[in-house]
């Protein structure tokens, strides 16, 4: 009995890989052997960058909070220390949003942090 190379399972797997490679440039989008490599590498990048995304956003929030705090003559580290001592538990994501969109509310937080530091 001869070996079957074009069975339903193989066709389904090939179709799945080609579908995932849609939008790629050159032979990567329509040649199975090349598409498999491209899709595999894309998965590696996606896995890595899902983790990097968390670090990047935290860094962005810290930069925004620091910029907002420095407008009121206070550094990021001193501001965060003041918030901790004041018992204000607001995460960096929310603080960054307040610093950008509600400067008056952020100034109130800076004043509370300054008061807690003494």
From Swiss-Prot:
Swiss-Prot/TrEMBL GO biological process terms: ribosomal large subunit assembly; translation
GO MF term list: rRNA binding; structural constituent of ribosome
Keyword field: Ribonucleoprotein, Ribosomal protein, RNA-binding, rRNA-binding
One Pfam match: Ribosomal_L20
Keyword Ribonucleoprotein: yes
Top-rank lineage group of the source organism: Bacteria
Entry-linked InterPro entries: Ribosomal_bL20, RIBOSOMAL_L20_CS, Ribosomal_protein_bL20_C
GO CC, any one term: ribosome
Statement: the UniProt record of this protein carries the keyword Transit peptide: no
Biological role stated in the UniProt entry: Binds directly to 23S ribosomal RNA and is necessary for the in vitro assembly process of the 50S ribosomal subunit. It is not involved in the protein synthesizing functions of that subunit.
Family: Belongs to the bacterial ribosomal protein bL20 family.
PANTHER family linked to this entry: 39S RIBOSOMAL PROTEIN L20 (PTHR10986)
Protein name: Large ribosomal subunit protein bL20
């Amino acid at each position: 009995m001869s070996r079957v190379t074009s069975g339903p399972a193989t066709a389904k797997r090939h179709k799945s890989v080609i579908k995932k490679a849609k939008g790629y440039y050159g032979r990567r989008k329509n040649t199975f052997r090349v598409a498999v490599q491209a899709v595999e590498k894309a998965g590696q990048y996606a896995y890595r960058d899902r983790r990097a995304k968390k670090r990047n956003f935290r860094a962005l929030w810290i930069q925004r909070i620091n910029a907002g705090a420095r407008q009121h003559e206070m550094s990021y580290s001193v501001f965060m220390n003041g918030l901790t001592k004041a018992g204000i538990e607001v995460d960096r994501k929310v603080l960054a949003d307040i610093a950008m969109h509600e400067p008056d509310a952020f100034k109130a937080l800076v004043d509370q942090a300054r008061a807690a530091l003494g």
